[in-house]
Regions:
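Polar/charged alpha-helical tracts
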Residues: 53, 115-117, 225, 229
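Catalytic NTP-binding/metal-coordinating core of nucleotidyl cyclase/transferase enzymes
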Residues: 2-81, 85
Length: 254
């Protein structure tokens, strides 16, 4: 085998996005195939619309979707729109989203394979595994990023009008992924503190380090949070002052 790329192959950096409907099998069993097919159809149509809006390309689909974007900013913009749509339309299910940035081999399928029902494009590379593992531990209201995707976001994310200005991000932990040699730092991006909490282990992802709980940073605190912050600390300081005053009297024999 030659190391040279074939004419139908190209290697480039892309944002790989994987989504997955949480509990899809249980949903079908509970509601029946007819109702499930209607919901999944509405869901898939929305996903395709958001992929087009953010200049992405669908690679594969089943219970979830595999897609690629030219930039991480486009991928995150897609994720925010997608998650918002699921919430606002009150879908009876939620989904996971994982985003990874990597150099991938993009393979264009031959015409006869496409005519037979095959995919037009395939992605090859370990990056697809990392994206899948990242997605697998995502909470139902979360958007998770790999380390490389997070760095791309921090570098270029401010340029995107589709990423909310109030978006917050946090390192949620270090995970060891099955089939991936090096541990992966995973980040969450969201609008509220609850969306930035560390996800638990998954079948193919084990958490090996990181904070147990993510707390809001000073610049992200809301007004009522600042009030509570000052009351709590003011009360603690007052307690120390009172203790300082009465401590000598407690041990004064007179």
């Amino acid at each position: 085998m030659s190391n040279e790329l074939s004419k139908n192959m190209v290697e480039q950096y892309i944002a790989i996005v994987l989504t997955d409907i949480i509990g899809s099998t249980r949903f079908v069993q509970k509601n029946g195939s007819h109702i499930a097919a209607q919901w999944f159809g509405i869901h898939d149509k929305a996903v395709m619309n958001f992929i087009a809006r953010h200049n992405g390309q669908l690679i594969d689909a089943s219970d979830g979707h595999l897609m690629m974007f030219a930039t991480v900013s486009d991928a995150i913009g897609f994720a925010f729109d997608y998650k918002k749509y699921i919430r606002k339309r009150k879908f009876p299910f939620r989904s996971r989203v994982g985003i990874h940035w990597d150099k991938m081999l993009i393979v264009k399928s031959e015409a006869h394979m496409v005519r037979a029902g095959g995919k037009r494009i395939n992605l090859e590379g370990i990056g697809k595994n990392i994206a899948a593992r990242t997605m697998s531990i995502c909470g139902e209201e979360q958007i998770l990023l790999s380390k490389s995707a997070y760095f791309q976001y921090k570098k270029y994310g401010h340029r995107s009008r589709f990423i909310p200005n109030k978006a917050q991000s946090a390192l949620v932990g270090l995970y060891r992924f099955k089939g991936v040699a090096e541990p992966e730092a995973i980040y969450a991006i969201g609008l509220i503190e609850a969306q930035l909490q560390p996800p638990p282990d998954g079948e193919k992802a084990k958490r090996i380090g990181g904070a147990k709980k993510i707390r809001s940073r000073a610049r992200d605190r809301k007004f009522w949070e600042w009030i509570w912050w000052f009351i709590w600390r003011g009360g603690f300081v007052s307690f120390l002052m009172i203790l300082y005053i009465i401590w000598p009297a407690m041990f004064d024999p007179n």
